[in-house]
Design a protein with these regions (language model features):
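Gly-Asp-aromatic-enriched flexible segments
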Residues: 3-156
Length: 156
């Protein structure tokens, strides 16, 4: 009988690298320590991390080392239900930062969520990146107000 790999829910404090969010360099915030409700598509989350972004083409990322014997990484991504701009699309991307190989991505609008499930058996490190897309005719100077959320991260 094969042994089941242990589950591990990484926290923001355990990240090995963090890229601040956008031109104003907002910091990533732990959902459990936030004063605001963190909800994606009407589902509330308390485990994970989020960051505020104010301009088109803003981006931010968080990286974790993959634990030994981990086979799968799951995480849910989306924009906070309380984001003020409803016409903004955010691309959520999970990659191997060592090889720069994109493992999965999704472009999500407000009220959309995606649960990623990534095979990490041969990946030493994961990078979760969020990039605010510029709508046609917009530029980096276009002001927006959204919060991106990565929720319920779990290695198993």
């Amino acid at each position: 009988m094969a042994s089941k790999s242990p589950e591990w829910n990484p926290t923001l404090d355990q990240a090995v690298a963090k890229e601040r969010c956008g031109a104003r360099s907002y910091s990533w915030e732990t959902l459990s320590e936030s004063d605001d409700v963190s909800a994606i598509a009407q589902k509330t989350y308390t485990n994970g991390f989020k960051c505020h972004m104010e301009y088109s083409l803003d981006a931010g990322s968080v990286e974790f080392l993959v634990p030994k014997d981990a086979k799968t990484f799951t995480i849910t991504a989306g924009q906070s239900d309380y984001s003020r701009d409803t016409n903004v699309t955010v691309t959520f991307e999970i990659s191997d930062p060592i090889s720069d190989k994109v493992l999965d991505s999704a472009s999500l609008r407000l009220n959309e969520a995606k649960e990623f499930s990534i095979d990490v058996s041969s990946v030493p490190r994961l990078k979760m990146k969020a990039l605010v897309e510029a709508a046609p005719g917009e530029s980096r100077k276009s002001n927006i107000s959204i919060t991106v959320i990565w929720a319920d991260p779990k290695f198993s």
